[in-house]
């Protein structure tokens, strides 16, 4: 018996704003929206079921120990789209026969796209 990844959860200052960004990034759709909590659900019910956003009083102050990795058929076009949604490009890295771009979401959470 093993576990499976059910949700990815973000602590954030503004759940509504951050969930709008990640909804545009992933295509996940809002199913619960409150001032202090937003839940997005996967439209196709495969993989991670949803992304949760919980309001916390303090902003992010240090590098995350965990991050989300995204894949795209055309990473460069997707990076430009994500920047248009409010993401920030931080770094480009190569290793182990692959490459990826490190980015920040609107609240400073790290994620990568390759």
Roles of regions detected by a PLM:
Residues 1-19, 66:
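N-terminal beta-strand motif that seeds the catalytic metal site of vicinal oxygen chelate
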Residues 2-10, 31-33, 38-42, 46-54, ...:
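Vicinal oxygen chelate
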Residues 15-29, 78, 82-86:
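Amphipathic alpha-helical segments
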Residues 61-82:
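Mid-chain, well-packed structural core segment of small domains
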Residues 14-15, 74, 100:
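Residue-level preference for nonpolar/small residues embedded in alpha-helices
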Residues 55-60:
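Short, flexible, solvent-exposed loop/turn segments with mixed acidic/basic and small polar residues
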């Amino acid at each position: 018996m093993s576990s499976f990844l059910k949700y990815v959860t973000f602590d954030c200052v503004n759940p509504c704003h951050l969930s709008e960004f990640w909804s545009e990034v992933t295509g996940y759709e809002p199913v619960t929206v409150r001032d202090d909590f937003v839940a997005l659900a996967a439209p196709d019910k495969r993989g991670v079921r949803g992304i949760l956003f919980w309001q916390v009083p303090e902003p992010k102050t240090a590098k995350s120990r965990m991050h989300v990795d995204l894949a795209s058929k055309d990473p460069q076009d997707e990076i430009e789209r994500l920047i248009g949604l409010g993401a920030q490009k931080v770094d480009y890295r190569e290793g182990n026969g692959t490459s990826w771009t490190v980015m920040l979401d609107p609240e400073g959470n790290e994620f990568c796209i390759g």
